[in-house]
């Protein structure tokens, strides 16, 4: 009955969306394509060629990897058999301020995987609270794992995830793992699907230079319908982009929810230092440490140390998402601020590694991340200007174009294996516009960081003048950049 109700609601949602598109089409005057609109169409088309060519390229590459390349590679891994088994598996879980129910789900799945993978395994628990340790010990005693499965606790101060990871990596170093050992780094809100360890650990024997790989994600959201759909859409987009970048062995982030590394990587003092105390020397904002973005730091460290990165699309995990605010608008903006800040803090120095290290396609993708904050809002800005100059029909034309293209993009996302819903087209456009505005805002404020789960913010300890200068120079540059952007478009439309 519940399934039928859900299906009917989905169908009603799609019918409502299609009705909106038909209403927009009916409202358009026949004179919309006269000579007055040539500059409008040229600008929208020129930017569209760049944006859609990047999207289509990612999609085609992703489908080639998912349905052609990866199945071939998986057959090669299976032929290796037990020769691809690592000597030891470390499953390291970091937990802080996560509710007991989620913690129990996470450790239940981790202990199950440690037992069922059939390999010598050590579960490393990087914990802050004693209550979590008591819970894990109780679950461990109940599971009664075989002797080849060990348990190791690392007590850490509640000073952030980076410190928790570094303490855990040093604890693994004390086990003195050999070159065939691997380490899975798992977040405290990540529930492992069955067989995820067995599906991820053999790849390091197939690819000698892969230093780390990451996994496919699905989610359970403790929030409303729109918040849930928003997260699910992001994971569907992530899946295609990961597949695309895996084709070049240049996956752009070692996702903190679950990634697997060679043990010799996470025990490398340089790698530990990169994750624990990563920093950026900015020409205007000075030198500051990274509070968040350990997944980006680990990726950059792998690139700098000369390793490749990979993605295993059929190794899935389920994350339990706790929105930081009850309001969708507030929660999504807060999460975007953190995610895009992490992305942009890594972007410029990643490009500094050079085309020879990154490859041509990866360099283009990183460059696109920098310009997309402006190209994403160009169409809407031009449509608004044109509607003031020539009439509101131009805005209707733009909205119809957006509605049709986002519908097509949503249907294409279904090929990723993730479910789609009728809210996806509108959420896609919300992400484009609000995401671009958040990127512009954070681009000029890279030194401002905070966690969404815990009340931890970056303390700069700057002199009063430096703090004043950073604040006002950020505001001035944001206003100047926005003004120049609009002024240029006003002269062109």
From Swiss-Prot:
GO terms for cellular component: plasma membrane. One of its GO terms (molecular function) is hyaluronan synthase activity. The keyword Transferase applies. Pfam families: Glyco_tranf_2_3 (PF13641). GO terms for biological process: alginic acid biosynthetic process; extracellular matrix assembly; hyaluronan biosynthetic process. It is a multi-pass membrane protein. It comes from Pseudomonas syringae pv. tomato (strain ATCC BAA-871 / DC3000). Its main location: membrane. Belongs to the glycosyltransferase 2 family. The chain crosses the membrane at residues 13-32, 47-69, 380-402, 422-444. This is Glycosyltransferase alg8. Keywords: Alginate biosynthesis, Cell membrane, Glycosyltransferase, Membrane, Transferase, Transmembrane, Transmembrane helix. Pathway: Glycan biosynthesis; alginate biosynthesis. It is found in: Cell membrane. Its EC number is 2.4.-.-. Possibly a processive enzyme that polymerizes GDP-mannuronic acid.
